[in-house]
Amino acid sequence: MRRILVTNDDGIYAPGLRAAVRSVEDLGEVIAVAPSGQRSGVGRSVSVFEPLRMAEVNLDGKKAYAVSGTPTDSVILGIFVVMNGELPDLAVSGINVGENISTDTVTTSGTIGAAIEAASYGVPAIAASIQVADQGDKFDNNHSVEYKFDTAMNLLRRVASRVLERGMPVGVDILNINLPLNATEDTEIVVTRLARKIFKTAVEERRDPRGRPYYWIGGDLICSEREGTDVRAVYQEGKISVTPLTIDSTAKVDFGEIMDLLEVI
């Protein structure tokens, strides 16, 4: 039987994780291993300075595992402890509450970080996310609205089934799926590339009661981007974005140009 590892960065009890499990549970044996709490924005960080604990939990009547660390930690423990070092046939990360579009989020998202970790072992990975109505909902499980996962579940199941049957296209490690707010079964699906930015980075300085400064990193959304990008598809066109990702970050350039650059050093 095929085995599917499911994880996320919103925590083991997040409704999106439950939705992801339900979406693929008829495709094989599902092993759900996820952080014990909210760990958004931690990227692919690994806990190397503290021990990890893992607890068996009940998730809708089925066994799952809560990990004290990051999404990447969860993938590692899922593969090397729960699965005894045997690789799953597919890894699913999500369904995340909060769109993971542009290089800004792909390089900082715990959802994507978990998918990258799975892909590093040769496991095909799918990351699925839905757009939020309020950016604060990305970091707080007490959401401003009730998010519906039906469309995301149906799409995730179809994509997962196809990947299990055919494998990933050559050169693709991860499929990053992002659904706009209020997507339906009729919403158009487009294949996109990553936009460069999603936030206009800003730093807000505040003062504590003793007058010492502290800082919040934030910034306004960039909702207008070039044609063919994930940001444009989701924000401007209201389409479902599917971005093929590779974990090989090597720039696709003529190495001779780099040698020419180095010759002057």
UniProtKB/Swiss-Prot annotation:
Binds 1 divalent metal cation per subunit. It holds the Pfam family SurE. It is found in: Cytoplasm. InterPro entries: SurE, SurE-like_Pase/nucleotidase, SurE-like_sf. It catalyses: a ribonucleoside 5'-phosphate + H2O = a ribonucleoside + phosphate. Its cofactor is a divalent metal cation. GO terms for molecular function: 5'-nucleotidase activity; metal ion binding; nucleotide binding. The keyword Transcription does not apply. A divalent metal cation binds at residues 9-10, 40, 96. Keywords: Cytoplasm, Hydrolase, Metal-binding, Nucleotide-binding. Its EC number is 3.1.3.5. GO terms for cellular component: cytoplasm. Its main location: cytoplasm. Nucleotidase that shows phosphatase activity on nucleoside 5'-monophosphates. Belongs to the SurE nucleotidase family. This is 5'-nucleotidase SurE.
